Structures are given as C-alpha cells and as structure tokens.
Amino acid sequence: MGKKKQKKGSTSCRELTFDEEKRREYLTGFHKRKMQRRKAAVEEIKRKIKEEQKKMREERHKEYMKMLKEREEALCELEETDELEGLVTSKCESVQYDHPNHTVTVTTISDLDLSGIGLLPLGKAQQEEEEENEKDADEEQPKSSVSLPKKAGDPFLSKKICSLTASLHARSQRKAGKRPSRTNDKKKQTSGKQVSGRTSKAQRRKQTGKIGRNRD
C-alpha cells in the first residue's frame, strides 16, 4: 500500500485555552455583579437626592430673602405716610374737579407742623417733652433687632425628591428579601395529623367492622 497523500492547503487545528480562575469567577459571579450594580444604583439615587435638596434649599432661601426685602420696603412706606399724616394738624374740606381724562382733588391745609421734619427748630419745652416720651416708649417696648425668621420644621420636598426616595425605599426592600417562615409549615403539618388518643372497646370494634366491610 502506498502512503496517503496529504491534502494541499491543510492547516493545523487551533486550540483555545481558558484561564480556569477567570472562567470560574465569570460563571459563579452573576449574583456578585448583580449586587454591585444594585449598590451603584442606590448610591446614584442618594447623590441625586442630595443635589435636589441642595437646589431646593437655595431656591427657598432666595424666595425668602425677596419676601423679606418686600416687607421691609412696605414698612418703610407705611412709616413715611404715618409721619406725613402726623404733621398735618387740621384740614379743610377737599374739592374735586372732574375732567374727561382725570379727576383733580384739591385739599387745603390750614396748619402744618414743620418742626416734625426738622425744617423748624423746636422750643426747649417741646424738646424736653419729646425726649421724655421717647424714654418712656423705650422702657415699655424692649429693643427688637431685625433677624431672619427660623426655618420651618417640615422639609420642603419636591416631586422629584419624593420619587427618588420611593425608588430608594423599593430597592432597599428588595435587598432585604424576606425569607418565608418555617413556623407556618410546621403548623400546617401538625394540623393535618389527627390527634390520636385512647379509644374505648366499642369504638375499636366499630372501626374494625368498617375495615372488614370495606375489604368485602
């Protein structure tokens, strides 16, 4: 017999070798990788909640300062109007003139205390009386310093924060994973079993009679 001829262009077979440790880690590490992904998702949710809370605090502070500024301006305007009204001691009747586009009201003032603004100097007696009145008012009313109001006790939460906290709570519940209790299974097993106790002779005869009839 002649020798077998080798086929032209034949190539040797390639052999693939795997690292056993890495292969074992990959095949047995599905749960581990799943827990790592879940942990990373929880950390991301916590980070988003902190950023949203910080943003809400800044917005709340800006609105609060704006409201405080508006109140201070309104108080200043009221004080100015009260001072002007206090200077007028007596008024005459006002007269209104109606025009097609607007109305004009003319009020005549007979007496005006210009010393209240500081345009005219007060007499010594009036100065002493005002100083005494100011001292009495200071004693009756304690000094109040303008300060920012305290923050509210309840946190100011947005819809985004509520949704993030709900998802975080759901993930934590999944992570906990309640195990089924074995006490219920034991109770079911015990309830299925018949309680065996002492029986009388007549009862035993009845039972044996029933068994015999069934056999027949």
Swiss-Prot record:
Residue stretches of biased makeup (Polar residues): 191-200
Biased composition (Acidic residues): 128-139
UniProt xrefs under Pfam families: Nop25
InterPro entries tied to this protein: Nucleolar_protein_12
The keyword Ribonucleoprotein is assigned to this record: no
Signal peptide: none
Superkingdom as given in the UniProt entry: Eukaryota
Region (Disordered): 120-154, 167-216
Cellular localization per UniProt: Nucleus, Nucleolus
Coiled coil residues, start to end: 30-83
General function of this protein: May bind to rRNA.
The name this protein goes by in its record: Nucleolar protein 12
